[in-house]
Regions:
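A short, conserved beta-to-alpha structural element at the edge of catalytic cores
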Residues: 76-102
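Acidic/histidine-rich helix-loop elements
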Residues: 2-14
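C-terminal domain-boundary segment and adjacent tail
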Residues: 11-47
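Membrane-embedded segments
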Residues: 56, 60-69
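Extended, charge-rich helix/loop segments that form flexible
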Residues: 93-177
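Hydrophobic faces of well-ordered beta-strands that scaffold small-molecule active sites
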Residues: 33, 55-57, 79-81
Length: 177
């Protein structure tokens, strides 16, 4: 989508113009194949062409249908779209998407880190948690794409804490933001 003019410009995604450039680059430099070609190649032990690319899209967002599909259709390209079963069968927003929304809904990531500090302190005895500083030192490592605070928030809420606590905290923050 056109990120800067979208409803949630701070939700991480690929801007539509950059996606178009990527597709044009792949069309020029690679052989974009279909899922049927991959299956045929496996079933018949036939090599796929060199520099082959299979286009795949995780999460099956409406953005994919509204923005990606028309571009692929224009060039007669196929993409494989993978919808998360939990979101469909349970009619729920995935925690990873809630976390993206929370991060996009506040510019003050330090305030969000401080909220997490209070929540860790609140649940510390019940869940036998380490002190907050332990988690921050362990997880807050800046990456190429995210600041150390954003990485900390993502890692704490996606993997570090036990699942039921992660869900409680994510739901609390999602409701707030």
């Amino acid at each position: 989508r056109d990120l800067k003019n979208s409803r949630y410009p701070d939700i991480k995604g690929l801007d539509i113009n950059l996606f178009k450039k990527q597709i044009n680059y792949m069309r020029k430099h690679y052989h974009i194949i279909t899922m049927e070609e991959v299956i045929y190649s496996i079933d018949n032990q036939v090599k796929i062409p060199e520099k082959s690319v299979l286009l795949t899209f995780d999460d099956a967002y409406s953005d994919h249908y509204n923005n990606v599909f028309p571009i692929l259709d224009k060039y007669k390209l196929q993409g494989s779209f993978y919808a998360p079963s939990k979101a469909i069968t349970e009619h729920t927003v995935l925690d990873v998407n809630k976390i993206h929304f929370i991060l996009a809904s506040t510019e003050d990531k330090i305030n969000l880190v401080n909220e997490l500090k209070e929540l860790v302190k609140f649940y510390q005895k019940e869940y036998q948690l380490e002190d907050f500083d332990y988690y921050y030192k362990k997880l807050a490592q800046a990456s190429r794409l995210d600041t150390k605070d954003v990485i900390f928030i993502k890692r704490l809420l996606q993997v570090e804490l036990v699942e039921d606590l992660r869900i409680k905290i994510v739901d609390t923050l999602f409701e707030k933001y």
